[in-house]
Amino acid sequence: MGIVSPLGLGLEHNWSRLIAGESGIGRIASFDPSDLPAHVAGEVPTGPTESGCLTLSDWVPVKDQKKMDRFIHLGLVAATEAVEDSGWKPESEEDRCRTGVMIGSGIGGLQTIYDASITVHEGRARRLSPFFIPSALINLVSGHVSIKYGFKGPNHSVVTACATGVHAIGDASRLIMLGDADVMVAGGAEAAVCPLGIAGFSSARALSTAFNDAPDKASRPWDRDRDGFVMGEGAGIVVLEEYEHAKARGAKIYGEIIGYGMSGDAYHITAPAEGHEGAYRAMQAAVRSAGISVSDIGYVNAHGTSTMADDLELQAVERLFGDAGRQLAMSSTKSAIGHLLGAAGAVEAIFSILAIRDNVAPPTLNLDNPSTESVIDRVAHEAQRRKIDIALSNSFGFGGTNASVIVRGV
Amino acid sequence: MSEIADKVKKIVVEHLGVEESKVTPEASFIDDLGADSLDTVELVMAFEEAFSVEIPEDAAEKIATVKDAIDYIEKQKAA
């Protein structure tokens, strides 16, 4: 598994900072946000690799960097960590053909499109880089990963806004179940912390603006003072493998994907339906496909974006779990890293697997005063040690798309 | 070496990320310097920009080596 996020670079570095209750959110540094309503975001810290920060040239050769938007850079960083961590190095042509890639993004190369638009607007269309299109296309993370490692199996990509990461992992696991591949590199990557991205989500009144002077307080899922999400950037990538295939080669196995459910709201382009009934149906379908009962689930990594929709998701989880909710821990790790849009579901599925590995529920930061009381423990402020055998991770996207994935330790 | 040759060399080094010593007049962008077809398109654009010349597509297709580029630009500049 591999992560690059506002908490830094690398799986264990991210996890230990998350569990310690640290925040990766700050004032936007990559450009001056003063003219925009929202001034805060979660940006990947730049610095020496050994300090858990990003030095891009350690991962992507300098001459190739300009051929890719930043979301591809970040996807390649996390994919490199994940593939190397998995120890899977297919030597034979057959093994390479049985290894595929499904990495998505919610938006893709937004800054690249912005820059290219200006070039054309200025009447310099003939000066547009030949790398503009392949730099911006969402499926090019999958393309670059396949080229780097020679993975010749299914090469696919997902675009379902903020549900992308879960859909990629869920769909890739289904491809393995269907026999299309033995190994799939799956996840999401996003880098939309740019003027156009911040301005666009601001116009939709989706971003927090009340905490511009206290950035680490801005992402506060379920808290009564929340006022919108905080955008984050990064990537989360997993290597999925057919169980017997992984066992036979003695692979390090973090966990097993046991359930996956999807639904559509058929309601509104950005707002969830009443009672988040689409979320309820996605979670229900995931539980059904896992063949478990809700009381088996010890931890839910909520979509919990720090918007009004948090309480609707809470209602849907309460409805699904019933009395079993009293034993449940549910947190939103977006409180620490912000909303990574198309990468969110993948990063959060990884956090869910690590929650099982270490029997720790990561905290919901800034949950000072819940706007709604609940029997469900939302792990306010501090991580909790508790027995977690099975975890569920939710992601919901604009367009009314919902996905839930269930993981179990091995 | 002419000023044009120096500048061409610098652009090639910068765009293809190769060592200066490899950028000999005979070096082929694709065979010797690791460029692909899109790299050569970008390279020609960079020449156009740097020398304020127009390199039409049929001429660009014939520019395969460092020397080809230098010769073409010198000819345009002399004209």
From Swiss-Prot, chain B:
Pathway: Lipid metabolism; fatty acid biosynthesis. It holds the Pfam family PP-binding. The modification O-(pantetheine 4'-phosphoryl)serine is found at residue 37. Keywords: Cytoplasm, Fatty acid biosynthesis, Fatty acid metabolism, Lipid biosynthesis, Lipid metabolism, Phosphopantetheine, Phosphoprotein. PROSITE patterns: CARRIER (PS50075), PHOSPHOPANTETHEINE (PS00012). 4'-phosphopantetheine is transferred from CoA to a specific serine of apo-ACP by AcpS. This modification is essential for activity because fatty acids are bound in thioester linkage to the sulfhydryl of the prosthetic group. It is found in: Cytoplasm. It comes from the Bacteria. InterPro entries: ACP, ACP-like_sf, PP-bd_ACP, Ppantetheine_attach_site. One of its GO terms (biological process) is lipid A biosynthetic process. Its main location: cytoplasm. GO terms for cellular component: cytosol; membrane. The keyword Isomerase does not apply. Signal peptide: none annotated. Residues 2-77 form the Carrier domain. One of its GO terms (molecular function) is acyl binding. The keyword Lipid biosynthesis applies. Carrier of the growing fatty acid chain in fatty acid biosynthesis. Belongs to the acyl carrier protein (ACP) family. HAMAP family: Acyl_carrier. This is Acyl carrier protein. It comes from Gluconacetobacter diazotrophicus (strain ATCC 49037 / DSM 5601 / CCUG 37298 / CIP 103539 / LMG 7603 / PAl5).
